[in-house]
């Protein structure tokens, strides 16, 4: 990794048709210049938390405070929201992420190894249980209900007003 003393010979060939005399900034995608950081909420799970000062504090037209008070309270609101969020995430984000990971791992394990095998077993057994239940219903419960229904169908009530 020493000092290079040789000259590099570089040439660039461009067609006149493909060469644009514009800088290209006016044609660029504006989203590339907004924020190059990753989107931490791609599914918009917390879109309801995007609250501004005007969403929380609102003065009607008839009652306005002094402009300096409004500006200072707006600045204090934004700064305190920013600082408190950073402070809370420093102390709570890692432990809560750890606990959430344990919780979701436990729930996943229970779902995969206990709940789904139980459900699949029940679904495998249910056709035979259904056949047995239908036989019991046809042999015992249906005749019993039929005889009770016939007994009560012969009962008649007569009301008289005396």
Swiss-Prot record:
One of its GO terms (cellular component) is Golgi membrane. PROSITE patterns: CAVEOLIN. The keyword Ligase does not apply. Disulfide bonds: none annotated. Phosphorylated on serine and tyrosine residues. CAV1 promotes phosphorylation on Ser-23 which then targets the complex to the plasma membrane, lipid rafts and caveolae. Phosphorylation on Ser-36 appears to modulate mitosis in endothelial cells. Phosphorylation on both Tyr-19 and Tyr-27 is required for insulin-induced 'Ser-727' phosphorylation of STAT3 and its activation. Phosphorylation on Tyr-19 is required for insulin-induced phosphorylation of MAPK1 and DNA binding of STAT3. Tyrosine phosphorylation is induced by both EGF and insulin (By. similarity). One of its GO terms (molecular function) is protein kinase binding. The modification Phosphotyrosine is found at residues 19, 27. One of its GO terms (biological process) is vesicle docking. It is found in: Nucleus; Cytoplasm; Golgi apparatus membrane; Cell membrane. Residues 87-107 dip into the membrane without crossing it. Pfam families: Caveolin (PF01146). Keywords: Cell membrane, Cytoplasm, Golgi apparatus, Membrane, Nucleus, Phosphoprotein. May act as a scaffolding protein within caveolar membranes. Interacts directly with G-protein alpha subunits and can functionally regulate their activity. Acts as an accessory protein in conjunction with CAV1 in targeting to lipid rafts and driving caveolae formation. The Ser-36 phosphorylated form has a role in modulating mitosis in endothelial cells. Positive regulator of cellular mitogenesis of the MAPK signaling pathway. Required for the insulin-stimulated nuclear translocation and activation of MAPK1 and STAT3, and the subsequent regulation of cell cycle progression. Monomer or homodimer. Interacts with CAV1; the interaction forms a stable heterooligomeric complex that is required for targeting to lipid rafts and for caveolae formation. Tyrosine phosphorylated forms do not form heterooligomers with the Tyr-19-phosphorylated form existing as a monomer or dimer, and the Tyr-27-form as a monomer only. Interacts (tyrosine phosphorylated form) with the SH2 domain-containing proteins, RASA1, NCK1 and SRC. Interacts (tyrosine phosphorylated form) with INSR, the interaction (Tyr-27-phosphorylated form) is increased on insulin stimulation. This is Caveolin-2. The gene is CAV2.
